[in-house]
C-alpha cells in the first residue's frame, strides 16, 4: 500500500438520506468544532427532500467541506465512500440527524496524540424522542488505555449498554475517533448488515494496538421511530449480523478462545435488538387494531428466534453457568422470553411505560 498522506488532523464523515429537518444543525455542529485543522465530508445517499441543497450551501461557504452524492446505496456504502475521500490522520463517523458538542474533536484528538492511540472512545447521550427522555451512558471509562483485544473482549461482555460494573465499551460508532491508517492498512470495510456499527467496531478493535477513553459527554444520538415492518424484519436479519461476527472471529483465529464469550454475546445481542423493537412498536402505534396486529406478529417472530438451534444452544450454555456475567435485566428478560414470548413482550412494554420514562 502507498504511504498514507494526512492533509488534516481529522476527517468528519457525515452520511445522510432525506435529513432536511436535521442536517443544517448537524453541519453547523461540525463546522463549529474548536479543532481547526479538520475536513468535513458530506455523503448524500440519494436524498430527494432538499438535503443536498442544504449541504451545498455549506460547501460553497467553507473550503474544508466536500460533498459527494450517490444513488441510494445504504449507510455502509456511504461510509466507505466517505473514507475513500478522507485525508485526515483520524476519521470519525457522525449521523446527519444527531448533535455534537463543539470541543469533541479537539479533546479526542489530543487524547489520541497523547496516548498514541488508534481509537479514542467518548461518552454519549441517547434521546428517546417519542417519550422526550434523555439518557446517558452511565459507566465511567478507565483513566488508562486498553489494548485493542482487551477492548474487544469488553465489548463482547457489554453488547451495547447493559451497564455492568466491569463492562464499559459499547458498539456504537459515532462516539469513536479512529486512526485512518488502521482502517486502510487492514482493509476494513463496512458490512451491509443490520447493526453494522458493532461489526465494524469489532474489526477495528481486533486490529488496534491501543484504545483510549475520555469521560466527556459530547454526542447526542436521537432515537427516532422507524417503520413497523422494518422494526420486526430487523429481528430476522440479525442472524446475518451474528453470522458475520462469527466468521470474523474464525478468520482472526480467536473463535475457540472467545466461544464462551460469544455465546453470551449472542443471547444479549438478540435481547437488545428485540427489546428495542418492542420500544419502537410501543411508542409508534396509536391505532389499537394495528397495535394488536403488530404485537402478535412480533410475538410470532420471537417464537421463531427462540426456536433456533443456535439460540437454544447458547441459552443452555448460559443456563449451565447460572447466567454468570450476563447483566441482571437481560438475564431476567431472557428467562422470560425462553418461557413465553408473549409474556416477554407484555413485560417489556410494562418496563418501558413505567420505568424508562422515569
From Swiss-Prot:
GO terms for biological process: lipid metabolic process. Disruption phenotype: Mutations in the predicted active site result in a recombinant protein that is unable to catalyze the formation of the cholesterol glycolipid. Keywords: Glycosyltransferase, Lipid biosynthesis, Lipid metabolism, Transferase. Pfam families: Glycos_transf_2. GO terms for molecular function: glycosyltransferase activity. It catalyses: cholesterol + UDP-alpha-D-galactose = cholesteryl 3-beta-D-galactoside + UDP + H(+). CDD domains: Glyco_tranf_GTA_type. Pathway: Glycolipid biosynthesis. It comes from the Bacteria. Its EC number is 2.4.1.-. It is an enzyme of class 2 (transferase). Galactosyltransferase involved in the synthesis of cholesterol glycolipids, which are formed by the use of host-derived cholesterol and have been shown to be immunogenic, and possibly contribute to Lyme disease pathogenesis. Catalyzes the formation of cholesteryl beta-D-galactopyranoside (CGal) from cholesterol and UDP-alpha-D-galactose. Cannot use GDP-mannose. Belongs to the glycosyltransferase 2 family. This is Cholesterol galactosyltransferase. It comes from Borreliella burgdorferi (strain ATCC 35210 / DSM 4680 / CIP 102532 / B31) (Borrelia burgdorferi).
Amino acid at each position: 500500500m502507498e504511504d498514507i498522506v494526512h492533509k488534516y488532523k481529522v476527517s468528519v464523515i457525515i452520511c445522510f438520506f432525506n435529513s432536511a429537518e436535521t442536517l443544517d444543525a448537524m453541519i453547523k455542529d461540525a463546522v463549529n468544532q474548536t479543532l481547526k485543522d479538520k475536513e468535513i465530508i458530506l455523503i448524500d445517499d440519494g436524498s430527494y427532500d432538499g438535503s443536498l441543497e442544504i449541504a451545498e450551501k455549506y460547501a460553497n461557504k467553507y473550503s474544508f467541506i466536500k460533498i459527494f452524492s450517490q444513488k441510494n446505496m445504504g449507510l455502509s456504502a456511504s461510509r466507505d465512500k466517505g473514507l475513500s475521500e478522507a485525508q485526515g490522520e483520524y476519521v470519525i463517523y457522525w449521523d446527519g440527524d444527531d448533535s455534537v458538542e463543539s470541543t469533541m474533536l479537539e479533546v479526542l484528538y489530543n487524547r489520541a496524540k497523547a496516548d498514541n492511540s488508534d481509537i479514542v472512545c467518548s461518552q454519549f447521550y441517547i434521546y428517546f424522542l417519542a417519550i422526550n427522555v434523555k439518557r446517558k451512558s452511565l459507566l465511567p471509562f478507565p483513566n488508562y488505555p486498553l489494548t485493542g483485544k482487551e477492548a474487544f473482549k469488553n465489548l463482547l461482555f457489554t453488547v451495547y449498554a447493559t451497564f455492568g460494573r466491569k463492562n464499559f465499551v459499547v458498539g456504537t460508532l459515532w462516539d469513536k475517533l479512529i486512526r485512518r491508517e488502521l482502517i486502510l492498512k487492514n482493509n476494513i470495510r463496512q458490512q451491509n448488515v443490520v447493526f453494522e456499527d458493532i461489526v465494524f467496531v469489532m474489526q477495528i478493535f481486533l486490529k488496534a494496538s491501543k484504545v483510549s477513553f475520555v469521560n466527556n459527554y459530547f454526542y447526542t444520538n436521537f432515537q427516532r421511530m422507524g417503520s413497523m415492518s422494518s422494526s420486526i424484519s430487523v429481528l430476522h436479519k440479525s442472524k446475518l449480523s451474528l453470522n458475520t461476527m462469527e466468521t470474523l472471529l474464525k478468520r482472526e483465529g480467536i473463535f475457540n478462545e472467545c466461544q464462551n464469550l460469544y455465546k453470551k454475546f449472542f443471547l444479549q445481542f438478540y435481547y437488545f435488538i428485540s427489546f428495542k423493537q418492542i420500544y419502537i412498536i410501543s411508542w409508534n402505534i396509536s391505532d389499537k387494531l394495528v397495535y394488536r396486529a403488530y404485537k402478535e406478529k412480533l410475538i410470532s417472530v420471537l417464537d421463531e428466534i427462540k426456536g433456533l438451534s443456535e439460540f437454544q444452544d447458547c441459552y443452555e450454555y448460559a443456563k449451565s453457568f447460572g447466567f454468570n456475567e450476563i447483566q441482571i435485566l437481560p438475564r431476567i428478560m431472557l428467562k422470560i422470553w425462553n418461557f413465553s414470548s408473549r409474556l416477554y413482550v407484555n413485560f417489556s412494554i410494562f418496563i418501558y411505560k413505567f420505568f424508562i420514562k422515569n
